[in-house]
């Protein structure tokens, strides 16, 4: 999955062990060596290091090494998002990216001095995020003047997803004021949504009754983050089909609105959302049904899901809210 490049090598290995542990709670060293290119001793030391963190953070997962492999043990209160958050906080690569997004004018020299890391090392770490850049249709500027190149709306969407990663307890009420502030800050620094970009966004979501310029983007944030209750007329067929489906009778109108907001993100932006990234151990049958209804009732559904390979994960998340 695309976000794994944000982790350092050790943390990425632990995440892979966790993912393998979802299929079988015991993983042999042979399998881990093929997957992670680490020796058995290195994997054992990683497990011991994680035990120290787990004793303090209580995230609900432990990796217990033995002579032949690793046993993955989960407690009842285990949360995948909390594990990811703990691993992410250890990552210098993530810190560098976050700083660059928060302050687009910061230079590689300033980052080098602040973190006591060579300039080339910082550049290599940012280059190592190539899967992320490609997924969000962004790229690095070779001379590091602007560093991250691409549509401003895409950069803000990436910021939104990375901010969600830093809220493992899902306190999403802080997202709207944060995104409004960072959007205004970036605009004041000259990183604005251009007239051409506004036209591109409107062509992707023509049902929106406002222009997606800087002012319109503020209103879009309110919609995406649940402050504006609005369902376009083109979703009437979807709404009727959803409410008539016996398996979905227990869900309210608010759920339909949440689904539209999710669809709107898929329409407007490239890149996996955090809801798409986390894969539930067992998919709700209702989520799979919802995908089928969307394919039939949502206009141009195939077009805006073409670049999103894990849409059902998002449906699962929305239905469990």
Question: Model segments located where?
Answer:
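A cross-family "folded-core" feature that marks the main globular domain of proteins
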Residues: 1-321
